[in-house]
Amino acid sequence: MAKLTILIALVAALVLVVHTSAFRSSEQSCKRQLQQVNLRHCENHIDQRIQQQQEEEEDRARKLRGIKHVILRHKSSQESEELDQCCEQLNELNSQRCQCRALQQIYESQSEQCEGRQQEQQLEGELEKLPRICGFGPLRRCNINPDEE
């Protein structure tokens, strides 16, 4: 019985070591991937979306004031290309955890340019939508804004 207990303890310790090693390896792999992938297209896409939202809000405000001149904006081919390339970049990352880290990295770099909490919320919202738009569904347990954890 004592030998069985020792054997079980050794197996449990071995499983823990292997799991910890795999996790550490996964973290290092993600860091390498994030250094290699260029997230510029994602940043450009998010910038365009936030700018578009602001223009739409300004247009609504003009309408409410009775100004009839409203700019209709259609999605340009450049915007579509930025989104496509962004999705390709995110898809290159091999795990949801790594994709989440990429979105957090974009948030950290882009939030510095935000003028107020409303723009930060728009940024967060656009980043949360991105995985669904790219076709790999919502990221589970991914807090885009690491300051809110």
From Swiss-Prot:
Gene Ontology CC, one term: endoplasmic reticulum
Family label: Belongs to the 2S seed storage albumins family.
Sorted UniProt keywords: Allergen, Disulfide bond, Endoplasmic reticulum, Signal
Entry-linked SMART domains: AAI (SM00499)
Entry GO MF terms: nutrient reservoir activity
Descriptive protein name: Conglutin delta 3
Disulfide bonds: 30-98, 42-86, 87-134, 87-134, 100-142
Keyword Acyltransferase listed: no
Keyword Metal-binding included in the entry's annotation: no
Signal peptide positions on this chain: 1-22
Subunit (UniProt): Heterodimer of a small chain and a large chain; disulfide-linked.
Localization: Endoplasmic reticulum
